[in-house]
Regions:
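Cytoplasmic helix-loop-helix junction between adjacent transmembrane helices
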Residues: 23-62
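Structural signature of the two symmetry-related core transmembrane helices
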Residues: 1-10, 200-215
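A membrane-interface helix-boundary motif in multi-pass transporters
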Residues: 76-89, 279-305
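Multi-pass alpha-helical transporter architecture, strongest
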Residues: 95-101, 299-320
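Short amphipathic helix-loop junctions that connect adjacent transmembrane helices
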Residues: 153-170
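Helix-breaking motifs and short loop linkers at transmembrane-helix boundaries and internal kinks
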Residues: 13-18, 30, 164, 218-220
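Juxtamembrane intracellular "pre-TM" segments in multi-pass secondary transporters
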Residues: 103-140, 162
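Helix-to-loop junctions at the C-terminal end of transmembrane segments
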Residues: 184-198
Length: 320
């Protein structure tokens, strides 16, 4: 959070685009908030409740997805740099709270000593090879992250191209997605995992995601696309369930390393996904397209989730 705060300060002061890139680099180097939060939840919750805890992170993200653009718009109306100052202040307050107030999650005897071999991008990923089921579940998570990349990279282009939506309609779409995500991950995640188990909620989430992407891809009207938003929200069951299953396969001292590895997979997917989906979109709407299919990126994302379901079935046989 300190690095993120510094990033926003640089963007608020930026006289040119070079400063913006510098801020983004600092943010990327210090981007451990989600992995640290995941490790903390794994440390302080019993195994059977971890998926629900991870779901709360998703619910918080959904809340930010709703409130962030609204607050940023209000602040930016008076000064375009003010939203960055507000974001910097929020990040730094969060960092101070974590450092001075939040207690340590592990007793000293369960902590793992620091090693520089974990300080490289590959070191933490080695843990994923320590167990066959863990590696397969990590592959499921990676496919989910890769499929998710279609939304920030292509969704706005798609709805503008196919339905003629402007910024206002897109804003309502994003708000609806955030609200639905909050409901599923914040309210439904815990009772559903308690009733059906993490394995079943993982499959249900992947199935809903695959169906939702098909709805998006084949939607000929904007209202049909919107009808897919609640279905897609239940995809939010998959990520926390997969994380919960993975945390049960490593020791208490390895939870932070595991969350770092998961964050690494997310970063790799973020490198590959935008280019993959935007090029697919361009290919299927371009003049050389033999079959004009604007929704092709979403259908590709659906196939990735179906592949993830296959891997998850093989990895979790016998698990609840």
């Amino acid at each position: 959070n300190f690095g993120l705060g510094l990033d926003y300060i640089l963007m608020a002061l930026a006289p040119d685009i070079t400063w913006l890139f510098a801020g983004r680099v600092i943010s990327g180097i210090a981007s451990s908030s989600f992995s640290t939060a995941g490790a903390y939840i794994a440390d302080v919750t019993p195994p059977e409740e971890r998926a629900a805890g991870f779901g709360m992170i998703g619910a918080a993200f959904g809340l930010g997805f709703v409130l962030g653009p609204a607050v940023g718009g209000l602040l930016g109306a008076s000064d375009p740099r003010l939203p960055f100052w507000g974001a910097a202040a929020t990040s730094l307050v969060n960092a101070c709270y974590g450092f001075f107030v939040l207690p340590e999650s592990l007793p000293r005897d369960k902590r793992m000593s620091f090693s520089w071999k974990w300080a490289n991008p590959i070191g933490s990923l080695v843990l994923l090879r320590s167990h066959h089921e863990l590696f397969s579940l990590a592959a499921v998570a990676f496919l989910g992250y890769l499929a998710h990349a279609v939304l920030p990279s292509t969704a706005v282009l798609y709805v503008g191209y196919r339905y003629g939506w402007g910024s206002t309609a897109v804003g309502f779409m994003l708000a609806a997605a955030g609200i639905n995500a909050m409901i599923v991950q914040g309210l439904l995640m815990k009772p559903l995992t308690a009733r059906f188990g993490e394995r079943n909620t993982l499959f249900a989430g992947l199935c809903c995601g695959a169906i939702g992407f098909c709805v998006y891809g084949f939607a000929t009207e904007g209202w049909i696309y919107c009808a897919g938003i609640p279905i897609m929200a239940f995809w939010g069951l998959a990520g926390p369930s997969a994380q919960g299953l993975m945390t049960n396969r490593v020791s208490a001292s390895e939870q932070g390393q595991l969350q770092g590895a998961i964050a690494g997979l997310s970063g790799i997917a973020s490198l590959i996904g935008p280019g993959l989906f935007t090029q697919t979109f361009a290919l299927f709407i371009g003049p050389r397209a033999g079959w004009r299919l604007p929704g092709a990126p979403f259908l590709l994302a659906s196939l990735l989730l179906l592949l993830g379901m296959t891997l998850a079935w093989r990895a979790t046989r016998g698990a609840r």
